[in-house]
């Protein structure tokens, strides 16, 4: 009788656990890191990530990594054409290194999210010969009946492969063979694979790639079987109703089974922070909807959107840190991009610590979301107080009852007076920042910009610069010719555009700057910053006008008093008698003196 009771209890617990698998935890206060970008083979090596486990785990609760299965090569392969499901040698390291990394992060309280690619596969030696694999007493076999009959628009059949699966239940993918999810064999193999990822390799959850490629209800079936703690789908669409429809479509046993990336918010972020259309932040998104914010994974950029426009990207080129401050103050689960983490690490640490100090979660209430002509005001309610974020140029916001927690270009984040900011204030050091080549000079009152051209742009670089009233580059495309001012250590040429004090009337609805290879190819429309240093990736930083040998890019020198001096990486150098003494005696470099940044040239 006792054994029967124990068995029934175990079965009941199993059923309850399955029933609670609802895509993403409710009231979740975690922050996620996308631990890779396109071709990040060095930065995302399993050993490289593991070496940073202590630092990363202090900020992030989940880290999303690339698809780790073997793709018949370990060279320049991101994993999006999977071949082997149970062999995890990859361009990022060995399977042993992967297992060790996952275990190390788990010991520090951080889970690893696997990029799961089950819309399509690649063959082992030809288009369709998926390998037979064994795991846990099960053998996975495949036939041509497991591939959609209309795969690759009929090209697969036309090339002699008699695929006999059903028609695709979603969008076609031309790069690999689309799996027929209506087939029981396909679904059984996928369930075995997902179980292996969780129970054998130790992954904590799934990021499903290209979920537009098959019907949403299959995600519900797979997650009900595998029971991941975390699941998020890449439903790449700016229409919030379509993304909500996909989330609802994952329901199984009456419950939603997966979150989704908030692409509607991503496009609103691009317009607001990239073009000054602040009202877009008040538009409908997953995170702004109380009914769906639990299932919203918000982001500024990812490995796909962060690529150049000609490669299908939709990158944010300006005010990137301010945009990260926005997602870290909103409901939803924020996912920080590795490139942004590397560039703005210390500021992001402070923003994340502030989010946790206030007690913001994926289901926090939005108290206020209001646009003005030059900025946006956001107020959200956490479990320990309120967060008040001022974006752009907001000068009339009421901050009585709030204390300033973090500030930077185009943003100020306040929290309720009673919130404990000890953890935020304990984070020392400054961001890696940007240092332009020494040959980049800006004269007082000069209107100019610099462009580091790609190596294959061989013509004279031209510039097209405008605002809502005027064009400053002649008014005829491709604009004004730039002057080559130097070559970087990497061998790329840097060009400078300087305004010649003539302008033509313009009726543009925005303002910006474009550089081109004498017309084509060209950059995207980039936000104009006077003295800005640009690449095809966007604005890297601003070169300040040269006045003396010692400049302070952030603020003028305060009155003389003894203040601590730190290097840019946070190392204390001592307490000089006053700032003037420090600036005269320190070697060339960037220093933090009295919480302000100074450049000694």
Describe the residue ranges of each PLM region.
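Bacterial N-terminal signal peptides
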Residues: 6-15
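Aromatic- and acidic-residue-enriched segments that line the glycan-binding/catalytic groove
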Residues: 74-83, 120-162, 224-225
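Active-site-proximal helices and loops of the catalytic beta/alpha 8
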Residues: 22-38, 48-57, 67-69, 74-81, ...
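Substrate-binding cleft of carbohydrate-active enzyme catalytic domains
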Residues: 93-134
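C-terminal outer-membrane/trafficking sorting elements
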Residues: 548-601
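Sec/Tat signal peptide C-region and signal peptidase I cleavage site
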Residues: 16-21
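Aromatic-rich carbohydrate-binding modules that target alpha-glucans
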Residues: 454-505, 520-525
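Boundary/entry segment of secreted carbohydrate-active catalytic domains
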Residues: 22-45, 172-179, 183, 448-452, ...
